Amino acid sequence: MKVIFLVDVKGKGKKGEIKEVPTGYAQNFLIKKNLAREASSQAIGQLRGQQKAEEKAQAEILAEAKAVKKILDDEKTRVQFKEKVGPDGRTFGSITAKKISEELQKQFKVKVDKRHIVLDHPIRAIGLIEVPVKLHKEVIAEIKLNIAEA
């Protein structure tokens, strides 16, 4: 019996995959537990439509990420921070991914999720710093931060 897997089933198939499995296994386990459904021509057509829509959505997300990367990679795009600095040359407060995201939104009207900003630890130094941003699994940009003394 041919079935379309609705979820990943270890050792049998991945979501969206069409596979031939024993009839008893399909009827008594996969279909009963909503892990798969019978691969009729209508169900296969519906699956193809869903896959096309998903591909289109992924292409749009990728295009949007590339557009944001182009803005961030521009030399004029420098996020300005003015922080109080102690005698040792380190800032009193640290600059976190959340702060960077908020300032980017304020200064350049570019929305970047704070979880996409890759910071090993909060920034406490002054000067020009480049921070990587993972906009998409294929697109990585760099934000230039200019941290000055207030």
From Swiss-Prot:
Keyword Glycoprotein recorded: no
SUPFAM superfamilies the record matches: L9 N-domain-like, Ribosomal protein L9 C-domain
Organism: Streptococcus equi subsp. zooepidemicus (strain MGCS10565)
UniProt cross-references to InterPro entries, sorted A to Z: Ribosomal_bL9, Ribosomal_bL9/RNase_H1_N, Ribosomal_bL9_bac/chp, Ribosomal_bL9_C, Ribosomal_bL9_C_sf, Ribosomal_bL9_N, Ribosomal_bL9_N_sf
One Gene Ontology CC term in the entry: ribonucleoprotein complex
Name used for this protein in its record: Large ribosomal subunit protein bL9
HAMAP family reported in the protein's UniProt record: Ribosomal_bL9
Taxonomic superkingdom: Bacteria
Keyword rRNA-binding: yes
Gene3D superfamilies reported for this sequence: Ribosomal protein L9, C-terminal domain, Ribosomal protein L9, N-terminal domain
Keywords: Ribonucleoprotein, Ribosomal protein, RNA-binding, rRNA-binding
GO molecular function, one term: rRNA binding
Protein role: Binds to the 23S rRNA.
Biological processes annotated in GO: translation
Family, similarity comment: Belongs to the bacterial ribosomal protein bL9 family.
